[in-house]
Every structure is written in C-alpha cells, then in structure tokens.
C-alpha cells in the first residue's frame, strides 16, 4: 500500500491495469459474452456494434471475447515462464554461491555462455531444438533467461555468506539448503522479484512473437500473437482486427515495465538489470 501511495500517477495507473489484467485472466471464462472459438461465418468481419463491442474476425468470432480469453493465455504463459526461471535461478545461483569452488566456476562459465547471446535469439534456438508448442516455448524462454537470475542470486549469496548469522548457522550444523532458506532467501528474493517484473514485458513479447510465427500457441486458441497473425491479411480493410490485440499487448508490456522500474527504484536502486534481449 505504501508503494502504491508513494508512486507516481503513471505507476499507480500501471498497477491498476495489472490488477485488471489479473482479474480478467482469473474470471473471464465465466462472463464472456461469446465462446471465443465459436465460428459464425454469416457474422464475419462485422464492425463494432451493440452485439459485438469490438467487431468480429474473419471467421465471425467475437473479438472482445477472444481478447479477454487471450489475456488468460498470455498472462498464464508468462507466469509459468517466471515460475520456472525463478526456480532455476534460485537453485543454480544459490548452489553456486554457497558451495563455491569448482561448482561455482563451472556454473558461471555456463551462465556466461548463455549471457553472450540475446535472449530472443536463444529462445528461437531452444524452440528449434525442443519443437513447437506452448509448453516448449515456455521452457525455451525460461532457459534463455535463467543465467541472469542465477548470476544475481549467486552474487547476493556470496556477499552474505560470510555474515555472522550465516556462519553461526553453519557452525550449528545447518546444511546449505537450511542456511539458504532460513537466512539468505529473504535477502535474495526482493532483488529477484524486481528483475522478474522488469522481464515480464519481454517475456510477453516473446510469447506473442512465437505465437505470431506459429511456434507457440496455435489457432483456434485465443492469444494476442495468434490474433495479430490472423488479422494480417485484413490489415487494410479491417485494421481494427489487428489494432485491439496489438493495443492489449502494448498496454500490458508498458504497465509491467513501469511497475518494474518503480520497484527497482523503491527496493534496490543500485540493481543492475541491463541485459540483452
């Protein structure tokens, strides 16, 4: 609440947008006016009216219903990416920082190799190796981002592992896992969440881009990238078909980026998060 009240108006608006997106993603399946996958050819390419607030697409599907349903798919995909990449970052980075030695050296050499390439290129490469489909796209995006999270966790753990409370815990017989959970996780997670919030926008663009190219979510499932791809051939005659999912993606990415920047300034102003996407 203090963060909300002390933030700029733009950040407050972004937080409201994110809350609204989360609400739509969680509840839209119960109040959509139309089935987002229902084909109605006699109603194809209709302009916005009282029955179809945003019009219909080339198959007569209600664009508003598809846009709301796509929110759930897009946000759900990104949350799955974040959960996986945070887990990898905590486990790999925490292990490297606490164990040290050859484990640390080997882990960081692998991380450096991953960090050499832009995450977008790595994501496409991973999809080429794993195959198409939403699950593989989620895994690919997580694998292209884990090194940044692992390196951050490792740096924070190294800076804390010689503190008196950590040494006392080790002397009492606590293992690496116990030391990390009891004493280090609380110091690591805030910085990790800042980086995660800053990365949500990039991940949303990656998921939408993969789906646009037919590598992730595929038709008839409603997803913003799929909707933009479906609307390509009608861009000159029915530009609103592409405008609505593009606007939803733009607003979502901007909202998460604004909140991420504000969180970084609020929690960790010295956090370095510049990495190649």
From Swiss-Prot:
List the Gene3D superfamilies.
MetI-like
Ranges where the ABC transmembrane type-1 domain occurs: 67-260
Where is this protein found? Cell inner membrane
GO annotation terms (biological process):
nickel cation import across plasma membrane
Gene Ontology molecular function terms on file: dipeptide transmembrane transporter activity; nickel cation binding; nickel cation transmembrane transporter activity
Extract the InterPro entries matched here: BP-dependent_transpt_permease (IPR050366), MetI-like (IPR000515), MetI-like_sf (IPR035906), Nickel_NikC (IPR014157)
Give the highest taxon in the source lineage.
Bacteria
Q: Which residues lie on this side of the membrane: Periplasmic?
A: 34-78, 142-183, 229-239
* Quaternary structure and interacting proteins, as annotated: Probably forms a heterodimeric pore with NikB.
In which family does this protein belong, per the annotation?
Belongs to the binding-protein-dependent transport system permease family. OppBC subfamily.
What is this protein's name?
A: Nickel transport system permease protein NikC
Give the organism, scientific name.
Escherichia coli (strain K12)
